[in-house]
Amino acid sequence: MSEGESKDSSGSECPVCYEKFRDLEGASRTLSCGHVFCHDCLVKYLLSTRVDGQVQRTLVCPICRYVTFLSKKSSRWPSMLDKSSQTLAVPVGLPSVPPLDSLGHTNPLAASSPAWRPPPGQARPPGSPGQSAQLPLDLLPSLPRESQIFVISRHGMPLGEQDSVLPRRSLAELSEASLAPRSARAFCCRSRALLLITLIAVVAVVAAILPWVLLVRKQA
């Protein structure tokens, strides 16, 4: 197989579940780093990185650790979405703890239920790797039948080495954590400066009034 054929073969399938994109029409999603994944794998990844049940507004590429920013849209049925657009339909109410693999380790790209099903007439081929994990949404009556819609933007940034040990914290939380000490130091400096200015003003007023008071007493 030539080098061009090898690149074309690797780019036509999801690097996580190895399903061919041509078998899942409209299911491919491209991150800002250029890596392409199927819709299901990205949604499972988002579900596994939730914090306090909230889906993060950033998505870290499992391959290159590049951060892609997401924007939230109004909730709609996944069947009403344009499958060719850069959207992710994340179901509401699914458990946030990912299942264990055969070795007892957590797999962030595995989930017990699907996030999206192909439209009628575009079913997965028999024996496909991701078919065993597909559960119809009809079998989950206790879960809300709605989804959070996120749009994959073209903007992103590399993930720093100091942030790689905190995959479950969003960039917003990291920025807030870094800004908190700065805000505290700035407030402390402003308080000290205000106290010093007040003290100087009081001393100046006393120094200006005291001679007049002494002069009035001496004349009296």
From Swiss-Prot:
GO terms for cellular component: membrane. GO terms for molecular function: zinc ion binding. Its main location: membrane. It is found in: Membrane. InterPro entries: RNF222, Znf-RING_euk, Znf_RING, Znf_RING/FYVE/PHD, Znf_RING_CS. Residues 108-136 are annotated as: Disordered. The keyword Zinc applies. SUPFAM superfamilies: RING/U-box (SSF57850). The chain crosses the membrane at residues 196-216. CDD domains: RING-HC_RNF222. It is a single-pass membrane protein. A zinc finger (RING-type) spans 14-65. Keywords: Membrane, Metal-binding, Transmembrane, Transmembrane helix, Zinc, Zinc-finger. Residues 116-128 have a biased composition (Pro residues). This is RING finger protein 222. The lineage of its organism: Eukaryota, Metazoa, Chordata, Craniata, Vertebrata.
